[in-house]
UniProtKB/Swiss-Prot annotation:
GO biological process, alphabetically ordered: peptidyl-lysine methylation
Coiled coil: none
Binding site for S-adenosyl-L-methionine: W57, G83, A84, G85, D104, W133, A150
GO molecular function: heat shock protein binding; methyltransferase activity; protein-lysine N-methyltransferase activity
Subunit structure: Interacts with members of the heat shock protein 70 and 90 families and of the TCP-1 chaperonin family, as well as with HSPD1, STIP1 and tubulin; at least some of these proteins may be methylation substrates.
An annotated GO cellular component: protein-containing complex
Protein name: EEF1A lysine methyltransferase 3
Keyword field: Cytoplasm, Cytoskeleton, Methyltransferase, S-adenosyl-L-methionine, Transferase
Physiological role: Protein-lysine methyltransferase that selectively mono-, di- and trimethylates 'Lys-165' of the translation elongation factors EEF1A1 and EEF1A2 in an aminoacyl-tRNA and GTP-dependent manner. EEF1A1 methylation by EEF1AKMT3 is dynamic as well as inducible by stress conditions, such as ER-stress, and plays a regulatory role on mRNA translation.
Catalytic function, reaction form: L-lysyl-[protein] + 3 S-adenosyl-L-methionine = N(6),N(6),N(6)-trimethyl-L-lysyl-[protein] + 3 S-adenosyl-L-homocysteine + 3 H(+); L-lysyl-[protein] + S-adenosyl-L-methionine = N(6)-methyl-L-lysyl-[protein] + S-adenosyl-L-homocysteine + H(+); N(6)-methyl-L-lysyl-[protein] + S-adenosyl-L-methionine = N(6),N(6)-dimethyl-L-lysyl-[protein] + S-adenosyl-L-homocysteine + H(+); N(6),N(6)-dimethyl-L-lysyl-[protein] + S-adenosyl-L-methionine = N(6),N(6),N(6)-trimethyl-L-lysyl-[protein] + S-adenosyl-L-homocysteine + H(+)
Organism per entry: Mus musculus (Mouse)
Compartments where found: Cytoplasm; Cytoplasm, Cytoskeleton, Microtubule organizing center, Centrosome
Length: 232
């Protein structure tokens, strides 16, 4: 679904560099996680090819745990996950009844697809697509009920691209859930305190102190509940 026409200055590889030094050895590891009564088997393909997309990060686990503890209702909802990596968040949403599109850069899609096949039964509504922020988000509809992202706020040059993508994808009555490790050196505070509130009503839904992860909930300004104010 991704557009093949890109500006050389905005090629995904130039904006989302693979951190080849993070995983110099190539190997696969399968881990099991339990959320909402589902046992998920997630394969992580470590190596320089995938880099940070290879592993299940703390923010993804925190977001899955939040969905379980808050009994977030995915039934019949149109859902999209950004920067999915292993796909664990989108897979859980699909198992909980969502009609889910799981996205990342093309290099990560094979890993996601393998995990979808391993966890989502035939007939489950989970599709895997390439999506490069700021380049081809308009290939996707702009009426998602839920937009999900876990640990996708860590490269400041991508922030404007992510904002534009969120603004397009989130439907007028939709909700965005973003879980993020709050790394000061990666600009997370700037994104959530200054940039995102310019376009959305934002609230801190949960703070996981042990792993330094915040979970934020955002909605378009014009449809936010009465009396709600931007997070500051």
């Amino acid at each position: 679904m991704a557009s093949s026409r890109t500006d050389p200055e905005t090629e995904p590889e130039s904006v989302f560099p693979r951190e080849i030094r993070l995983f110099t050895d190539s190997y696969s590891e399968s881990s099991r996680f339990c959320f909402c009564g589902h046992e998920l088997s997630i394969t992580q393909n470590f190596g320089s090819r995938l880099g940070v997309a290879a592993r299940v990060w703390d923010a993804a686990l925190s977001l899955c745990d939040y969905f379980e503890s808050q009994n977030v209702d995915f039934r019949g909802k149109k859902v999209i996950e950004l920067g999915a990596g292993t796909g664990i968040v989108g897979i859980l949403a699909a198992l909980q009844g969502g009609d889910v599109t799981i996205t990342d850069l093309p290099v990560a899609l094979e890993q996601i697809q393998d995990n979808v096949h391993a966890n989502v039964p035939p007939g489950g509504r989970a599709r895997v697509c390439a999506l490069s922020w700021g380049i081809d988000q308009h290939v996707f509809p702009g009426n998602y009920d839920l937009v999900l992202g876990a640990d996708i706020v860590y490269l400041e040059p991508t922030f404007p691209l992510l904002l534009g993508t969120l603004r397009h994808l989130c439907g007028p009555h939709g909700t965005i859930y973003l879980a993020s490790k709050m790394r000061a050196e990666h600009g997370a505070e700037t994104f959530f305190r200054r940039l995102l509130p310019q376009h959305f009503h934002l609230e801190l839904a949960q703070r996981d102190e042990d792993v330094n992860v915040n979970i934020y909930r955002a909605r378009h300004r014009e449809v936010a509940p009465a009396g709600q104010h931007p997070f500051c």
